[in-house]
Amino acid sequence: YYTPDYDTKDTDILAAFRMTPQPGVPPEEAGAAGAAESSTGTWTTVWTDGLTSLDRYKGRCHDIEPVAGEVNQYIAYVAYPLDLFEEGSVTNMFTSIVGNVFGFKALRALRLEDLRIPPAYSKTFIGPPHGIQVERDKLNKYGRPLLGCTIKPKLGLSAKNYGRAVYECLRGGLDFTKDDENVNSQPFMRWRDRFLFVAEALFKAQAETGEIKGHYLNATAGTCEEMLKRAIFARELGAPIVMHDYLTGGFTANTSLAFYCRDNGLLLHIHRAMHAVIDRQRNHGIHFRVLAKALRMSGGDHIHAGTVVGKLEGEREVTLGFVDLLRDDYIEKDRSRGIYFTQDWVSMPGVLPVASGGIHVWHMPALTEIFGDDSVLQFGGGTLGHPWGNAPGAVANRVALEACVQARNE
């Protein structure tokens, strides 16, 4: 399974793994074992190998390079033939590529750094339900980032007070407010009550400001059926957008919801709760840029992508790398930004990156410069923490944004 002379095909799915072999295990052996375990191999030779063409179906570790400045760490490049994967299933792709190999004895640690998805495969996915351009047309908002706000305290408000907070923020000038990812349907606020009060707030703010407003109604639930029930109710109320936690909810549920949203004209906001469990470690897990690519294939119109400046972790160049992977059609390989492969999305719509987490109005110049127009800037405490209240907090954010955009345009 270690084939250094292999030339990759345009249809191969390419993976870059950062591997730390156990002491005494040569990197070639570790790379080959990983390629085997995540494709056709098993721990021994079996009779039934003779009944198929392993040359056609096996994953190949075709290049290994040491990581600069690290002891006993290597980047292993593995190519997988397209036939190993079910079309249109992120779930199956991850089950194959990262399903078993991370528990391997020969490896002390393993991290999936990047994936190259060939157009032949990405074309089998729904992708974002609408994409950036359609969203701007639906909202009739152009030439500036969109503003959001997560309603806090995240848990404990009654539905009516929650609706009031939503109204104040939207009335003050925000484009969106957001259910916190933990808000599903708890005893103090059942989902249907929340949806009803929020819809009222939405239409009242819309009527008073003459702008289209949205609130990310969190449809995440314990079962797929319940999730779709909530999305359907949101659509019946006339809400423009719903929300889903794609890692805790799972890719299967997420893709089902994306299909529903596309068919019914709902935008889909994606929250990445649980991502740090998977991507925080430097040498083990899956890098967020892979999770971001997976989301673009599975379907979502917004996704949280770190801030570069707030309370949560994120390095600037690397963050910008996966922001481009979310928005652009064609992204060149660039190792300085952690992009191991050139990625061609052909015509798959883009996803709006959402900057959220510990940012406030003083960060606005930096945020508009870093993220550009196609983004959503979300201030939770940065709106509701205003000493004069929610609406003035929203006004402050909107004024700051307009000022930054005007300064840039002049």
UniProtKB/Swiss-Prot annotation:
Intracellular or extracellular location(s): Plastid, Chloroplast
Catalytic activity: 2 (2R)-3-phosphoglycerate + 2 H(+) = D-ribulose 1,5-bisphosphate + CO2 + H2O; D-ribulose 1,5-bisphosphate + O2 = 2-phosphoglycolate + (2R)-3-phosphoglycerate + 2 H(+)
Remarks, miscellaneous: The basic functional RuBisCO is composed of a large chain homodimer in a 'head-to-tail' conformation. In form I RuBisCO this homodimer is arranged in a barrel-like tetramer with the small subunits forming a tetrameric 'cap' on each end of the 'barrel'.
Name this protein carries in UniProt: Ribulose bisphosphate carboxylase large chain
InterPro entries: RuBisCO, RuBisCo_large_chain_AS, RuBisCO_lsu_C, RuBisCO_lsu_C_sf, RuBisCO_lsu_fd_N, RuBisCO_lsu_N_sf
Record-level GO BP terms: photorespiration; reductive pentose-phosphate cycle
Subunit details: Heterohexadecamer of 8 large chains and 8 small chains; disulfide-linked. The disulfide link is formed within the large subunit homodimers.
Keyword Metal-binding applies: yes
Active-site feature positions: K152 (proton acceptor), H271 (proton acceptor)
Keyword line: Calvin cycle, Carbon dioxide fixation, Chloroplast, Disulfide bond, Lyase, Magnesium, Metal-binding, Monooxygenase, Oxidoreductase, Photorespiration, Photosynthesis, Plastid
Post-translation changes: The disulfide bond which can form in the large chain dimeric partners within the hexadecamer appears to be associated with oxidative stress and protein turnover.
Record-listed substrate binding positions: N100, T150, K154, R272, H304, S356
Gene this chain is encoded by: rbcL
Classification via NCBIfam families: PRK04208.1
Site (Transition state stabilizer): K311
Cellular-component GO terms for this entry: chloroplast
Family, per entry: Belongs to the RuBisCO large chain family. Type I subfamily.
Record lineage: Eukaryota, Viridiplantae, Streptophyta, Embryophyta, Tracheophyta
Function of the protein: RuBisCO catalyzes two reactions: the carboxylation of D-ribulose 1,5-bisphosphate, the primary event in carbon dioxide fixation, as well as the oxidative fragmentation of the pentose substrate in the photorespiration process. Both reactions occur simultaneously and in competition at the same active site.
